[in-house]
Regions:
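Acidic-glycine-rich active-site phosphate/pyrophosphate-binding loop
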Residues: 16-35
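Thiamine diphosphate
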Residues: 3-8, 32-174
Length: 174
């Protein structure tokens, strides 16, 4: 599955949500689909999207918060899984795109998921009540819709190909 295809599949459902992305490919591909004022791109903040999303979810419980994370990023901040599980915000959906490499820094470094580490199992072991791992666009869309309806903290790991955008440039006219 390509990340862009997965993002395109859920893009319409993101309209009413606060969306926090990690740096690089996720941010660029989401922006290319069409910037919205409720999209917050954490450029140059690898590892912090999950923490930022958690803070927003806790402080604004009336909003649905979607974090679009990456395997390298969450591996830099595994403690956020236990903190999310501790507070269990029902309005937080944590999507982790797992391509098994550090794509945004050159793709020359593999992550621990390339050798068997299972991020969905880590989230479940940390206490996240709803976890899933998917590898097709249809399964991703279905799992995302189920997360929206569940009103429960969810970590959704999407296995994707290590392919990035043609350009990482984002202009949000700030």
């Amino acid at each position: 599955m390509l990340r862009r295809d997965a993002l395109e599949a859920i893009y319409p459902e993101l309209a009413p949500c606060v969306v926090v992305t990690i740096m690089g490919a996720v941010a660029a591909e989401l922006h290319d689909l069409g910037h919205r004022p409720n999209f917050f791109y954490l450029e140059h903040a690898m590892g912090l999207a999950s923490s930022m999303g958690l803070g927003i979810a806790l402080s604004r419980p009336e909003l649905t918060v979607v974090v679009l994370d990456g395997d390298g990023s969450i591996l830099m901040n595994l403690g956020s899984l236990t903190t999310m599980a501790r507070y269990q915000p029902p309005n937080l959906i944590h999507v982790v795109f797992d391509n098994e490499v550090l794509l945004s820094v050159g793709q020359s470094f593999t992550t621990a998921t390339a050798t068997g580490s299972d991020l969905a199992a880590m989230a479940a072991a940390a206490g996240v009540p709803r976890t899933a791992k998917v590898d097709t666009v249809d399964d991703f869309r279905d799992a995302f819709h189920a997360a929206l309806k569940s009103k429960a903290l969810t970590t959704l790991v999407a296995k994707i190909e290590p392919e990035g955008p043609a350009s990482y440039f984002i202009d949000v006219h700030m």
